[in-house]
Amino acid sequence: MKISAFLFTLLVAAAFLAGACSTQGGGTQQGVGKIRNESESVDPKNAQSVRAQLKMGAGELNLTGGADQLMEADFSYNVAEWKPEVSYDVSGDEGELVVEQGGSGGSNLTGEARNEWEVRLNDELPTDLVVQLGAGESDLDLDSLALAGLKLQMGAGKTTVDLTGDYAQSFNASIQGGVGEATVELPSGVGVKAKAQGGLGRINAEGLERVGDSYVNDAYGESDVTLNVKVQGGVGEINLKVV
């Protein structure tokens, strides 16, 4: 994905602020170069569950299930400093996976930047997922994952989250809005209870009934599994939709 002028401006502003807050940090010039295509695969080893963190500063993230390993990913980028950093450790029977965009604060980009991640996670391992997004577009298809928890922090751009899976266990999902638009698709066959707190933006609820300070779907209180969603609005728009 080519980063739009608007998102590019936000990215440069964020980088400038990060540099200003760093300790005596001077800016460095980052040029746009040739496209680099890289693949990563992570073996779960003996982990019985995993905490996975994805931290992307700018670009396009497509996250799905279907990996035979713990994670299988393809990365394309043309700013050398943005090379993704992947780490994985196992403590006891729990794995800790971190995928983070490289690069330091206080940098100035020149040229047309490109950064695309295609990440696939394992469907069988219970996964506590943390996604931190900056500027760009993200498509998170999480319906096949064995989610144990979700924390999503959005930046500037457009994000779609698919939580329509037939989940085997209840879990909490926390969604923090940013600047832009987010659509969260929710299941009809699994109980959903959503609490939304405002910001400067707008929160829309489709297919959900207002009960007190919460929104619930028709399956709430009837199914063995409940998806508890906490939404903190930002400057943009968040759409909750039962499908």
State each model region's role.
Residues 17-20:
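C-terminal motif of bacterial Sec signal peptides marking the signal peptidase cleavage site
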